[in-house]
Amino acid sequence: MVDIVTRVNNVVNGFVWGPFGLALLFCTGLWLSVRTGFFQFRRMGYWLRHTIGAIFTNKDVTAHTSKEDMAISQFQSMCTALAGTIGTGNIVGVATAIVSGGPGAIFWMWVMALLGMMTSFAENVLGVYYRRKNEKGEWNGGAMYYLTDGLGAKPGCKAVGRVLAVLFACFCILASFGIGNMSQINSIAGNMNAAFHLPYLATGLALMAVTALIVIGGLKRVAAVTEKLVPLMALFYVAGALIIVVMHAGNIPAALAAIFKGAFNLNAAGGGALGYGISQTITWGFKRGAFSNEAGLGSAVMVNSASNVKEPVHQGMWGVFEVFADTMVVCTLTALVILTTGVVELESGAVLAGVQDNALVGRAFTAAFGSFGPKFIAVSILLFAYSTTLGWSHYGTKAVEYLFGTAGSRIYKVVFVCMTVVGATMKLGLAWDLSDTFNGLMMIPNLIGVLALSGTVVDITRNYFARRVRGEDIEPMWSAFEEYQKEEEAEAAAEEAELDKAANK
C-alpha cells in the first residue's frame, strides 16, 4: 500500500512541481507583471513607503484593533504571513537548490521571486476584495472565496468556481498537517537533539503545550505572538548571516559571479550531460523560489485578508514586500553564507566530502562561529519552523471553516495541536513528500482563479491610483459586496469627520 501511495504521489508531485506547474507559476507572474506595467519595479519606492516605511511613519499600520474589532493590524497580518512563509526552506531549501542546481539556481530563484511579487500582489488584492465576515465578525478571505464569488460569478463558471474552492480548501487542510506542522516540528526536534541533546518527546510535548496556548486562542493571539516573534527571528538570523558574509567579504564577487555564470551554464551541477545543467538549474531555482515565498500557493492570503485595511491595493503591496523580504533578503543571505565560506565548489555547487545538503548551512556557520555554529542554526530553525507552524495553523483553520463552519474549525485546532507530538517523534519521509504535493496542488486552483480575475486586479489597481495619486473623485473599489462596500465607506466618512473636527480645534 505504501509503495502504491509513493508511486502515485511521485507522479502527481512531478506534475504540480514539474515543468507544467512551474511554467504556470512563472507565466502567471509574468502576465500580472505585464498587465500592471511591472508595478513591482516601476512603483518600488511607492510600495516600500507604504509597507516597511509606513511602520515608522503611520501609527495606524501597527496599532492594535479594539477588542470588539475582530480584524488584526496590517503589521500583524504581515508578520503572521511571513511566519507562515519564512521557514526551514529559507535555510535548508536554499542549500538544496545550490547542491542540486548549482549556484546559478539562486539567479532563477530571484527571477521567480521578482515575478512572484505580482502574483502575491494579485492574490492579496483579490483576498481583501472578496472577503466576507463570519458570525464572530472575523474577516474570512482567501482563494476559496475569490474562486466561489469571483470566478463563480462569471457566466457558466459557478460550479467550476465552487469545485476549485473545495479542492483548494481540502489540499490546504492536508498540507497544514504536513508541511505546516509535522514536518516543521520534526525538523525542530532533530536539530534540538543534535545541538542540545534534548529528547524528541520532550521537545514535542513542550511545543504542543505552547501551541495549544496560542492556536486555540484564535487569530488575534497568533498575531500577537508573531508580531513579536517574526522581527526577533529575522533580526537574529540576518545579523548572524551578515556577520559571516562581512567576514568573507572578499569572496562576495566570486560568489555573485558563480550565481550569474551558473544561471546559464549548460553543464549540470556536479557534472552531467551537456545542456541538462541549465534545465536543472532553472527547475531547482524556480522550485525553491516557490517553496520559500509561497507566492501563487494562496496560503498567506488567508491571513492578509484578516487585516483592518480598507484598500485592497494596500494589502497587495504588503504581499509584494513579503516576497521581497522572504526571498530577496533572507534566502539571498543564506546563499551568500554558503557560497562565501568555501563549503561548496563555486563552479558546480559540489559540497565538501561528507557533508549533506541539509547540514550545509550548519557547516558554513561552524566554519565562521566554531562550536556555536550548530547551536545558532538550531535556534534559527526553531524560530523559523515554529513560526511556520503558527502561520499554517490559521490557514488550516480557515480552510476547515470554509468547508464545515466555525464548529469544525474548533475540532481542527485540537487535532492540529496534538499532531505536534506526532511530528516530533516519528520519521516523516512519506508524510513530507505527500504534504509537499498537497502544497503544490493548492497552487493549481489558486492560479486559475488569479488568472481568470486578473482584469479585476487591474481595475482595482487603476481605481486606487486614480483616487490616491491623481486625486480623481470616483467611487473606491473596496469590496465586491455592496453591504461591505457601504460599511467601509461609512467608516471612512466617520474617520474623515473626526480628522476635520480635530483640525478645527
Spans of features found by a protein language model:
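Transmembrane helix-loop junctions in multi-pass membrane proteins
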Residues: I4-V5, R35-Q40, N90-V94, S176-A189, ...
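Membrane-interface alpha-helices at helix entry/exit sites of multi-pass transporters
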Residues: K67-A71, G102-V111, D149, A153-V166, ...
